[in-house]
């Protein structure tokens, strides 16, 4: 009975695999395909796992309803036609099919290339050993711990706060929902297991909307700095002045913030990507920009000793990417801070208008309290609002609103010769030509091998042909500055992100896509892939421009890596849940120091912005806490 149940559960997945990657044409055998994809799907949260399986079952049923036969019993060409017919029903259905395709191709591709990926991970010695950290498992932590200050979150913001407070002589405890990873794990762990383990929701978090936006966020000691690209741009002076002048955020004054940006850059050891490790993907972008007369340059990154293995997104296997788990956190621990891992903070403890600590939950469901007079929340823009609401501190009407995502899109170009986009730095070079004028930042970007296959069009034979040509593909992406139109809410204890992209940002995306198309053709691409469902490869710039003009913007593939603004800091009590010093309004003893306090989109990768603002909030916290001791 159990075997029959297992077969019944796996059949819709095997059926989809037979249509997507037909084994008769060189795709994986059904059992192999199911094993590969199940390895990832079983790691998804229950709601995501249910949605995937329901979608697969719906596709299997649709084959019966439209042809009278199951997908595996059809000819491979007919299977592909069935998927095309289903996807053509509506933009929403097409997006759902593309979402299933993306999940399946990520899992299958990562396993296909696992041997190469792990071989490259082990090709060189580690650039540096793991840092000395005082990490205590929540299971080993007492039920009650006392400290001067507790920091919720160990990412870019939390790490800088912890270092500042500890160096000021305060007894600091940092609580982290995820766990500590070691460089040896990054060198030896299967890529799917790294991806599923390092990201919140196994990397399947999505902002609901039209279109939906994929929203990966790290969950580990070191936060998203463990899995980001390492790109370190300063916010422009115009952005800093906007925060100061429009929001009354004195902490963002360029003179003050500039010094803290210097500190963040020095902590991270930021430097431009060397050409010798950039990889051909980045060099093609620079060459194309030069031929068009556009401003472009290697990207500044925090990766001293990087060899260009393109695995930043699943944990650097050489410890070259210098996330805060390798600098600010060990510096905080050297000054006396402690980190408790596997501890999800459920609520802030407070009475009579003053906080006195936090309550966290261990994986086994038991709780632990950290009692402290100062609570600094650095859980990130999607998690901080929910924590404050669960704590009874979410009364401000703008909390959870004003969400900006800095949405990103991508085009791929086919070249006559090999590019091997994944042999080099994951995010290596940037075009700045449209940044000030249109809010569009273009970057040469790739993924670990096999994990970016969702850019390829079609199903069946067409898709397999593109997968075979993966080494000849270059990928350029763009992010557009957006307004804070999204929201973060809690539904039955789960975070729900909603983001409907505004018309102004759709116009920016069109500018971005046309500019990327020009770059790819200038670089020598013979065909350009848009990722728009049903759109064929483009062989000329006018053809691409025509397709982009006619395309439904709701069918664009969007991702976002930079959520900000959900607890904006500023002088206006009606507009900003957090005041101009970083203190949460309505309660004493609570500060916020993460991406949620950035009052508008920073218009660049936000790591430096978050760290510099966190330093500013930390200084305010020290002045307040030390002043009353």
UniProtKB/Swiss-Prot annotation:
EC number: 1.1.-.-
Cofactor needs: FAD
GO cellular component, one term: cytosol
Cited Pfam families: GMC_oxred_C, GMC_oxred_N, NAD_binding_8
Catalytic residues in the record: 562 (proton acceptor)
The entry's keywords: FAD, Flavoprotein, Oxidoreductase
PROSITE patterns cross-referenced by the UniProt entry: GMC_OXRED_2 (PS00624)
UniProt keyword Flavoprotein present: yes
GO molecular-function term, one example from the UniProt record: oxidoreductase activity, acting on CH-OH group of donors
InterPro entries documented for this protein: FAD/NAD-bd_sf, GMC_OxRdtase_N, GMC_OxRtase_C
First-level EC class: oxidoreductase
Alphabetized SUPFAM superfamilies for the sequence: FAD/NAD(P)-binding domain
Record-stated family: Belongs to the GMC oxidoreductase family.
Protein name, entry field: Uncharacterized GMC-type oxidoreductase Rv0492c
Classification of source organism: Bacteria, Bacillati, Actinomycetota, Actinomycetes, Mycobacteriales
């Amino acid at each position: 009975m159990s075997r029959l149940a297992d077969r019944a559960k796996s059949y819709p997945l095997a059926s989809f695999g037979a249509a997507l990657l037909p084994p008769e044409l060189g795709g994986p055998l059904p059992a192999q395909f199911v094993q590969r994809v199940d390895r990832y799907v079983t790691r998804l949260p229950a709601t995501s796992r249910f949605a995937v399986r329901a979608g697969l079952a719906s596709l299997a049923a649709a084959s019966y309803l439209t042809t009278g036969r199951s997908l595996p019993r059809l000819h491979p060409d007919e299977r592909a036609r069935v998927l095309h017919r289903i996807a053509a029903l509506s933009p929403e259905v097409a997006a759902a099919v593309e979402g299933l395709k993306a999940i399946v191709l990520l899992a299958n591709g990562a396993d296909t290339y696992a041997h190469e990926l792990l071989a490259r991970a082990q090709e060189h010695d580690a650039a540096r050993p793991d840092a000395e950290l005082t990490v205590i498992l929540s299971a080993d932590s007492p039920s009650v711990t006392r400290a001067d200050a507790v920091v919720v979150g160990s990412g870019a913001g939390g790490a800088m706060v912890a270092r500042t407070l500890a160096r000021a002589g305060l007894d600091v405890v940092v609580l982290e929902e995820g766990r500590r990873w070691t460089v040896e794990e990054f060198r030896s762990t299967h890529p799917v297991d790294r991806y599923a383990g390092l990201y919140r929701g196994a990397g399947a978090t999505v902002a609901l909307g039209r279109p939906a936006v994929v929203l990966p966020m790290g969950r580990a000691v070191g936060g998203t700095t463990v899995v980001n690209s390492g790109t370190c741009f300063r916010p422009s002076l115009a952005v800093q002045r906007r925060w100061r002048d429009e929001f009354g955020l004195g902490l963002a004054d360029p003179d003050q913030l500039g010094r803290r940006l210097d500190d963040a850059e020095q902590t991270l050891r930021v430097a431009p990507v060397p050409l010798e490790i950039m990889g051909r993907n980045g060099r093609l972008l620079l060459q194309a920009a030069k031929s068009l007369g556009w401003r472009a340059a290697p990207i500044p990154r925090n990766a001293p000793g990087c060899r260009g293995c393109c695995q930043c997104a699943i944990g650097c296997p050489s410890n070259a990417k210098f996330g805060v788990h390798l600098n600010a956190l060990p510096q905080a621990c050297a000054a006396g801070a402690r980190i408790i891992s596997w501890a999800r903070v459920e609520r802030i403890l407070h009475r009579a208008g003053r906080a006195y600590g936090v309550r966290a939950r261990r994986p086994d469901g038991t709780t632990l309290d950290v009692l402290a007079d100062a609570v600094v929340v650095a859980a990130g823009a999607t998690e901080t609002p929910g924590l404050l609401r669960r704590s009874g501190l979410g009364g401000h009407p703008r909390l959870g609103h004003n969400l900006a995502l800095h949405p990103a899109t991508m085009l791929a170009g086919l070249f006559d010769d090999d590019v091997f986009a994944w042999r080099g730095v994951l995010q290596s070079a940037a075009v700045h030509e449209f940044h000030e004028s249109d809010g569009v930042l273009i970057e040469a970007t790739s993924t670990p091998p096999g994990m970016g296959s969702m850019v390829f069009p079609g199903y069946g034979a067409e898709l397999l042909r593109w997968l075979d040509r993966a080494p000849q593909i270059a990928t350029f992406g763009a992010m557009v500055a957006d307004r804070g139109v999204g929201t973060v809410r809690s539904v039955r204890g789960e975070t729900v992100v909603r983001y409907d992209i505004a018309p102004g940002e759709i116009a920016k995306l069109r500018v971005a896509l046309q500019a990327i198309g020009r770059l790819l053709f200038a670089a020598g691409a013979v065909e350009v892939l848009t990722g728009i469902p049903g759109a064929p490869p483009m062989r000329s710039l006018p053809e691409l421009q025509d397709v982009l003009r006619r395309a439904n913007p709701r069918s664009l593939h969007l991702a976002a890596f930079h959520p900000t603004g959900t607890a904006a800091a500023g002088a206006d009590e009606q507009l900003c849940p957090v005041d101009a010093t970083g203190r949460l309004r309505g309660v004493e003893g609570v500060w916020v120091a993460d991406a949620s306090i950035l009052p508008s989109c920073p218009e660049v990768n936000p790591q430096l912005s978050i760290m510099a603002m966190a330093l500013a909030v930390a200084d305010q916290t020290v002045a307040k806490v030390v002043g009353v001791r």
